[in-house]
């Protein structure tokens, strides 16, 4: 199966994985399937020593693709299937046999935060941020993944207010290893 949303280029023992689902790299069912396929393949590649995950455009990943759910008639089991494939799309990164570096090129929101939190090392451009905006659409989610990175107080602030933690604060808190100019992120 070829992938169209999760792109992977390999050079010099580095797998550069790019989320390319315009306009905001939202997580659709196809996104989740391709993420699992790409990271499972990377785990089996002897010539790959590290993977770097980033997003195409101005957003790393804006979270769940709500638009893909509009107009769909729910069938029995849909909720559980969606939850399971979402979890697996995070676990394939956490369980990858190669270290995975997240290069936050822009905001990682909701499920996008979970993707970033699943990586082994995080770096960000000055435009990177992490947030849980679900409260703005009447939902509450993502806290489990945020708690792997943040303390209870900041996680609650993010969940209850939609606060986005900017790259400078992520660095100050020790969540990310470096902040770069946007044009230097992938160097």
Stretch-by-stretch model annotation:
Residues 19-23, 73, 104, 174:
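Short, histidine-centered active-site or binding-site loop motifs used for metal coordination
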Residues 17, 53, 65, 115-117, ...:
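Hydrophobic/aromatic residues within transmembrane alpha-helices
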Residues 1-56, 91:
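Conserved CoA-thioester-binding segment of acyl-CoA-metabolizing enzymes
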Residues 34, 47, 55-92, 108:
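Glycine- (often His-adjacent) and acidic-residue-rich active-site loop
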Residues 20, 55-56, 62, 105, ...:
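A secondary-structure boundary/capping signal
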Residues 2, 92-187:
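Crotonase-fold acyl-CoA enzyme core
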């Amino acid at each position: 199966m070829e992938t169209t949303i999760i792109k992977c280029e390999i050079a010099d023992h580095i797998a550069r994985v790019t989320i390319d689902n315009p306009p905001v790299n939202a997580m659709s069912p196809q996104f989740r399937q391709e993420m699992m396929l790409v990271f499972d393949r990377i785990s089996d590649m002897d010539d790959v020593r590290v993977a770097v995950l980033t997003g195409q455009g101005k957003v790393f990943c804006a979270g769940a693709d709500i638009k893909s759910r509009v107009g769909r008639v729910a069938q029995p089991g849909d909720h559980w299937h969606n939850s399971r494939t979402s979890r697996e799309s995070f676990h394939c990164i956490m369980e990858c046999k190669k270290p995975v570096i997240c290069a936050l090129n822009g905001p990682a929101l909701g499920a996008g935060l979970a993707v970033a939190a699943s990586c082994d090392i995080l770096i960000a451009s000055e435009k990177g941020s992490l947030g849980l905006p679900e409260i703005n659409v009447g939902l509450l989610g993502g806290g489990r993944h945020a708690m792997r990175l943040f303390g209870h107080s900041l996680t609650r602030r993010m969940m209850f207010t939609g606060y986005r933690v900017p790259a400078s604060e992520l660095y100050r808190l020790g969540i990310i290893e470096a902040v770069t100019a946007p044009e230097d992120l992938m160097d």
